[in-house]
Curated annotation (Swiss-Prot):
It is found in: Cell inner membrane. Forms a complex with MdtJ. The keyword Cell inner membrane applies. It comes from Salmonella paratyphi A (strain ATCC 9150 / SARB42). This is Spermidine export protein MdtI. One of its GO terms (biological process) is glycine betaine transport. SUPFAM superfamilies: Multidrug resistance efflux transporter EmrE (SSF103481). The keyword Cell membrane applies. PANTHER family: SMR FAMILY PROTON-DEPENDENT DRUG EFFLUX TRANSPORTER SUGE, SPERMIDINE EXPORT PROTEIN MDTI.
Length: 109
């Protein structure tokens, strides 16, 4: 395992924020009917992967990708709830709990 440096954690945090922004912008694009939002979504995805590429210089890929994906899913879920009124059913909540438990296990592995 590589030694953690805060700059790589910051890059990972930026990658997570950009992924969430990309997902929200994609929803706003309405299936790319609103092209400006669609293009911004693609730009955010590109920027997210660029930030993730910087993060993995100092964080193991398996850990960085799991945290990026997990936090991205959880935060996108929250954004969908707040911005679009989307709700999960009980099975969905079980999935979120399993996702969070898996992220914790990977972090401590």
């Amino acid at each position: 395992m590589q030694q953690f440096e805060w700059i790589h954690g910051a890059w990972l945090g930026l990658a997570i924020v950009l992924e969430i922004a990309a997902n929200v912008l994609l929803k706003f694009s309405d299936g790319f009917r609103r092209k400006c939002y669609g293009i911004l979504s693609l730009a955010a995805v590109l920027a997210a992967f660029s930030a993730l590429s910087q993060a993995v210089k100092g964080i193991d890929l398996s850990v960085a990708y799991a945290l990026w994906g997990g936090f991205g899913i959880a935060a996108t879920l929250a954004a969908g709830w707040v911005l679009f009124g989307q709700r999960l059913n009980p099975k969905g909540w079980v999935g979120v709990i399993l996702l969070l438990a898996g992220m914790v296990m990977i972090k401590f592995a």
